[in-house]
Amino acid sequence: MDIDAASVADDAGRVSLADLLVGLAMFAVVGAAAFTLLDEGRRAWAFGMARAETQQSARVALARLSAELRVAGRGGRGFDAVAVAAPDMLVLQQDLDGDGLIAANGERVTWRLVGTVLRRDAGGGLQPIVNGVRSFRVTYFDAAGAPTAAPGAVRSVEIALATRPDYSVVGSTVETALTTRVRLRNR
C-alpha cells in the first residue's frame, strides 16, 4: 500500500472540528446521564443501609432489654426487681445463685445512655451495646397501669429508643424510633 497514493473512493472521509465537537458533546451528555444514575443508585443504597442499621440496632437493644426485664426479680421476694426507677437509666435485680443477696456478677444489671452509646453493666463495667442512640427514655408503671417512680411498685416498663446511623447520609436524616412495654414476670 502506497501512503502517497491518491485516496480511493471507499476511504474514510475527513473529520472536521465541528464533527469532533458534536461527538464530544454527545459523549458528555451520555456520560453525565450515566454518572447521575450511578450517583442516585449509590445514594439509595446508602439510605437503605442506614435505615437497616438503625432498625437493627434498635431491635437488638430492645430485644435484650425486654428479655432482661421479663426475668427481673427472679430468685426471691426480699428485693425490688427494679432497683432504680429513673427516666434515663434502668437498674434491674435478680438473685441468680439463690443466696438471698444481690451481690454476684449479673445479679444487678444497669442500662444507661452515655453520649450516643447505650451501655450495659452487669458487674464488669459499662459495656457498649448499641451505637448511634439519640434518645433512651424509660417509663415505669404500677399494677394499675399508672406511672410510678417507686421501684417497689413497678410492674411494667415502657422503653422508648431512637437510633441514628454512625455516619451521615447526604441529603436525608435517617432515624428509627421504637417503643415497647414489658411486664415483669416475677412481680
Where are these regions (language model features)?
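Short linear sequence signals and composition-biased patches located at protein termini or domain-edge surfaces
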Residues: 2-5, 96, 126-187
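Aliphatic-rich helix starts adjacent to a transmembrane/signal segment
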Residues: 2-71
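A generic secondary-structure signal marking the coil-to-beta-strand transition
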Residues: 34, 88, 155-157
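Short, glycine/small-hydrophobic-rich surface segments
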Residues: 46-47, 52-53, 67-96
